[in-house]
Regions:
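A short acidic, helix-capping loop that chelates divalent metal ions and anchors anionic groups
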Residues: 2-6
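Conserved phosphate-binding/catalytic region of the ribokinase-like
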Residues: 7-8, 12-126
Length: 126
């Protein structure tokens, strides 16, 4: 979607150009999911790129929706930062390890447990 909205064809080397274009158009935060490769975020203060969680993917049908939902939950509590992106990235990673759409969406406890196993920080409370 970021490529379509910005009018710039996506390549591995032009994420920053796409993000800059969207920021200039008035967006506060640009978040681009990269599938198994992770997530890229840019705003006027910082740029963050996280690798994807290594999992055995079974069905990717709900990955994007799960990522967006998880990020929205965090954004209700705090600004987008590395911890927020890790939370959403983790939720999506868990989702792809299961079949189906709605049944694949993890619970909050499942995401917290996975993050703890992977030693990913989670300092905010829900």
């Amino acid at each position: 979607e970021a490529s379509f909205i910005s009018g710039i064809e996506y390549t591995d080397n032009n994420l920053e150009k796409i993000a800059e274009t969207l920021l200039k158009a008035g967006t506060s935060n640009v978040v681009i999911t990269l599938g198994s490769q992770g997530v890229y975020m840019k705003n006027v203060k910082e740029t963050i790129q996280l690798s994807g969680c290594k999992v055995n993917a079974i069905d990717t049908i709900a990955a994007g929706d799960t990522f967006c939902g998880a990020l929205a939950v965090v954004c209700a509590k705090k600004e987008i930062d590395q911890e927020a992106l890790n939370f959403a990235n983790t939720a999506a990673a868990i989702a792809v390890t299961r079949s189906g759409a709605q049944p694949s969406i993890p619970t909050l406890d499942e995401v917290k447990h996975f993050m703890l196993e992977k030693e990913l920080a989670l300092s905010f409370n829900f």
